[in-house]
Amino acid sequence: MDTKLYIDGQWVNSSSGKTVDKYSPVTGQVIGRFEAATRDDVDRAIDAAEDAFWAWNDLGSVERSKIIYRAKELIEKNRAELENIIMEENGKPVKEAKEEVDGVIDQIQYYAEWARKLNGEVVEGTSSHRKIFQYKVPYGIVVALTPWNFPAGMVARKLAPALLTGNTVVLKPSSDTPGSAEWIVRKFVEAGVPKGVLNFITGRGSEIGDYIVEHKKVNLITMTGSTATGQRIMQKASANMAKLILELGGKAPFMVWKDADMDNALKTLLWAKYWNAGQSCIAAERLYVHEDIYDTFMSRFVELSRKLALGDPKNADMGPLINKGALQATSEIVEEAKESGAKILFGGSQPSLSGPYRNGYFFLPTIIGNADQKSKIFQEEIFAPVIGARKISSVEEMYDLANDSKYGLASYLFTKDPNIIFEASERIRFGELYVNMPGPEASQGYHTGFRMTGQAGEGSKYGISEYLKLKNIYVDYSGKPLHINTVRDDLFQ
């Protein structure tokens, strides 16, 4: 699974001639190589995006949407190829890979359908013959930095709205999953995206990451990743005042009240915790269950978790962690929880797998009880199939514990009580609250958060607006001589 760079309409090697090995998280073996782009490669990609901007902007949103829609059709027609790449480089089970490609197709179609809805306004001026035309224009050059946990979905979520709104793009995917991104770029190119409009760069973030985000020609940076990386980007990009769309860390509370439909809550919890092996910004990372049902709920949760199959992506219920570093970090945080007095209710270690999967980066579904609210299990984003659980006795306690986090992206609540539902909608300080259902809900939802989760957002009409700058044109069409208070009229007599 080797990938190339795509710069100014050409598939090329890195100017350094260097490549980096890519490992399978399922087997731990090398499965391909990606190009190690240099600063010169970054410059060429950004210059190409700059040169292509005006022609792409002038094409108009309707014509741009036709190209984007063709890309969607090509992806849909050849989707099995993308599913296999996701399984190979990310390790997702086939069910999750198919679900991700469903999302790719849906998102691209959703954004393409917005072509005729990018409207502005005409505002009355200070008199009847003065008007203010307010309309939206593209920012210009967009740098899109995509993560490994949804290697295709996040590419679609960023590329489609950025291109529809007339921006040109330099895309840099995670070094762990460059193949999915390259495949999607090839479909956009095949669909007719002109040269320079979309450029594709791969390489270590430590080598070109700072350079690309602090580049003086970059107008907007959209990134999904860790809070630490987002903070670094904010610092580096501030010198040029680039617009930022940052979707960062999460620590989702999963709240189960005593009247909850237990089957629905458990089914959703299995998804919210073990989807993508817990490597999701909206993954359930903290479990709060009412004391009246805690023992029954936890017993069933443990038994269900015990039944999950790991290993071959074609048959597994849950995949591996992305790399050795993630595996080590997960082991360390579980050991720290043990040492602090927490109780491992299930899991807590790597599974014993045979055959090609014995060297994969798998970790058992892990449930931890009796952990302190201020411990890492409840405060730090774990990004693994690990969850801490606590009893709650009142709604006030539930709200307080849920909000006790530096993050504020997703949250989950299971109850039949309408009063709690509507009160929680106000009290829970998170960008997303899923009530009696799993997330994420459709492309038309706005994906955003509070606190250290980032800024701006993606999805829906609000997400499209993030890629557009509001511009104002002030017009006086009276044809009469102007009177300006601070300029004497007699100067013109």
From Swiss-Prot:
Pathway: Carbohydrate degradation; glycolysis. The record marks 149 as: Transition state stabilizer. Optimum temperature is 50-55 degrees Celsius at pH 8 and 63 degrees Celsius at pH 7.6. It holds the Pfam family Aldedh. It is an enzyme of class 1 (oxidoreductase). One of its GO terms (cellular component) is cytosol. GO terms for biological process: Entner-Doudoroff pathway through 6-phosphogluconate; gamma-aminobutyric acid catabolic process; glycolytic process; protein homotetramerization. NADP-dependent dehydrogenase of the nED (non-phosphorylated Entner-Doudoroff) pathway with highest activity towards glyceraldehydes (e.g. D,L-glyceraldehyde and D-glyceraldehyde), to a lesser extent towards D,L-glyceraldehyde-3-phosphate and glycolaldehyde, but no activity towards aliphatic or aromatic aldehydes. Belongs to the aldehyde dehydrogenase family. Glyceraldehyde dehydrogenase subfamily. This is D-glyceraldehyde dehydrogenase (NADP(+)). It comes from Thermoplasma acidophilum (strain ATCC 25905 / DSM 1728 / JCM 9062 / NBRC 15155 / AMRC-C165).
